[in-house]
């Protein structure tokens, strides 16, 4: 007999939220296939607070992962990246093995409306390596001096997809971004997609942009996730950067499924004075 048919309300315990680092990340112990609206609300609250959430020991099908993502909003389709056969909104991720250099970034900031949330599920893991690092961009902003914050408040930057051989895909975004749900301010430039400041040349932009994109991932802002079988990790592209660590043995597979939630156009709301 179902819970509804029996007329009995079963009290489910609140999900346990365990912080993972000083300024970013928490683990939430819950089965994502069996969450009601109340539990989802608590997950969303933890997500907005901690910026990335790790869900251990999941057994999600593509439909399960899509259903969870849709609780947050419409889905985002990556340009020029084919999805999984039969589930075109699920993007298979297979990075090269061996030791290679990655790039710190927020996803697809060359888009006028970059994705808001990424949800990555581990499907097959190497014997070692293949971590993902995350950096809190609220913390990156808050650690800047008052003078630097004042300078950046009126600035915009040009983002393009030239690192993906598509230089013609570009847009401009504010250098500081107001999160649409929390109202907090985040630094919003990254070394993969941000090319220069608007109304400046690349040469003129170079020094300040290099400082900001390096400052963005100071170690104290970061959490490094060591993937385990069954892990699902979601992060907020509006307030975090991430870095795929490509350091696993040659020939060993790291296979992931990614589902992405669509976002809005970045904006900066100056604080009231």
Regions found by a protein language model. Give the residues of each.
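Fe(II)/2-oxoglutarate oxygenase catalytic core
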Residues: 2-234, 238-273
């Amino acid at each position: 007999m179902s819970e509804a048919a029996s007329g009995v309300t079963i009290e489910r315990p609140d999900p346990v939220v365990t912080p993972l680092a000083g300024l970013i990340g928490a683990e939430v112990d819950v089965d994502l296939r069996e969450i009601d609206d109340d539990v989802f609300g608590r997950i969303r609250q933890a997500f907005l607070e901690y910026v990335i959430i790790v869900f251990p020991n999941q057994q999600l099908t593509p439909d399960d992962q899509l259903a969870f993502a849709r609780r947050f909003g419409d889905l985002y389709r990556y340009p020029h990246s084919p999805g999984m056969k039969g589930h075109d909104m699920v993007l298979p991720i297979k990075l090269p093995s061996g030791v290679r250099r990655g790039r710190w970034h927020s996803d697809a900031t060359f888009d006028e409306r970059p994705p808001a949330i990424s949800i990555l599920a581990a499907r097959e893991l190497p014997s070692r390596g293949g971590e993902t690092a995350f950096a809190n961009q609220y913390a990156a902003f808050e650690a800047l001096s008052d003078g630097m914050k004042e300078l950046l408040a009126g600035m915009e930057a040009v983002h393009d997809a030239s690192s993906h051989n598509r230089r013609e895909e570009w847009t401009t975004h504010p250098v500081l971004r107001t999160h649409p749900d929390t109202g907090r301010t985040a630094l919003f430039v990254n070394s993969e997609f941000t090319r220069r400041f608007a109304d400046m040349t690349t040469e003129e932009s170079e020094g300040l942009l290099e400082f900001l994109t390096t400052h963005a991932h100071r170690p104290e802002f970061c959490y490094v996730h060591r993937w385990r079988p069954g892990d699902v990790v979601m992060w907020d592209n509006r307030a975090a950067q991430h870095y795929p660590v490509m350091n696993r043995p040659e020939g060993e597979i790291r296979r992931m499924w990614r589902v992405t939630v669509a976002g809005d156009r970045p904006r900066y709301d100056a604080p009231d004075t």
